[in-house]
Every structure is written in C-alpha cells, then in structure tokens.
Amino acid sequence: RQWSRGLGDVYKRQLLWGGSLGIFCGLVGGKIDDVVMRIIDAFLSIPWILAMLLIVSLLGTTTLVLIPALGFFYGKGIVRVARAATHDVIAKDFIVSARARGHSNMSIIWNEILPNVRDAIMVEGAMRWSWMLLGFSSLSFLGFGVSPPTPDWGLMISNARGLMSFAYWAVLAPIFGLSSLIIGINLTADAFAKALGIDRSTKAPV
C-alpha cells in the first residue's frame, strides 16, 4: 500500500505548490505573473500522457518517479484556479486596508488571502486528485506504471483481460473498485463545493 499512501501525500503536495504559486502570482501581478502563467500555459498544452511516457522512458516506472510527476502535471491547473481566486480577493476593501497598514505580502497572503481562497483550492485539488488516480491506473493498464507485486487497479485490469471469456468478474472487480473511488471523490468534492457556496461552473479555465 505504499503507492496509495504516496497518492494521498501528492494531493497535499499539489495543493501546496499549485496553491502557493497561484496565490503569489495573483498578488504580485506584473511581469512575474505573466511569465509564470505563460510557462504554466505551455505545460498545459502538452498532453499529460505523452509527457508521462517520456518521463518513464527516461527515469523508470517506480512510484518515486510516477507519483511526483503526476502531482506536477495535475497540479498545474490549481495554479490558475488559485490565481483567479486571489484576483477576486485582492480587490476587496480589507486587502486595501491591510496594505495601508503596512502589512507585508507574506502577512497579507497568510492572514487575508489564504482563508478566502483555501476552500476553492481544496475543492479543485480533490477533483484533480480523482483524475490523477485514473491517470495512474491508466499508465499501469498500458504497461507504463507500477509492476507486480505492487497492487494497482489498472494493472489488475490489464492482467485479467485474458480471463474475460470465463472469469469476467476478475476484470469487473477492479473496474468497480476504481470507478467507485473516483465517483466517490468527485461527489464528495461537489458536495463540499455546494456546502461552501462555490460555483464550479464559473471557475477559471484550466
């Protein structure tokens, strides 16, 4: 179960790096914001599956390679969401007041911006975490993910394909497990968004 714990850790890591960079760019603006976002746009234009195939061909298919790489590619969209949420917040009067009182950017981020954008970032991160789980299993199904004896639903589905004619349940069981987990995460994230009053239909394009 080491890889499953790693996928849980990478959820926090993608929130940390994506949220931090997005908040920073949204606050400072200017040329730094433009340069960083153009770099993010360039990475977003690259199909994740092609990038992952290149990475595993160069660095291997260990969880130490797969999990951080997936966390990076699925965390890029959080940068845009955090940046858009920060733009909405910095126009508020309490941000103007904090700047007038001489608060540093770090103080404004920690005390004023983060509490107001945290929920949107967490909801987006949960949705992307479910996509990352699907991506991880897809790589294993194609033979570019983890190898036995590491347990993985994509690997189980791939190994059981030859049993479809007489033992279809060997394929259906991991499909059901993976689907249930992904749907459960998405439904939980949607419920969380509704409870917090977050309209995901108007979030920043990613």
How would you label these PLM feature ranges?
Residues 29-33, 37, 90-91, 95-123:
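Amphipathic cytosolic juxtamembrane alpha-helices at the membrane-cytosol interface
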Residues 9-17, 106-138, 185:
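Transmembrane alpha-helices
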Residues 50-54, 62-67, 71-75, 80, ...:
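Non-cytoplasmic
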Residues 3, 187-206:
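Short cytosolic juxtamembrane segments of multi-pass membrane proteins
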Residues 14, 52-57, 67, 141, ...:
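Hydrophobic alpha-helical transmembrane segments of polytopic membrane proteins
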Residues 12, 35-39, 54, 67-72, ...:
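Residue-level signature of the transmembrane alpha-helical core
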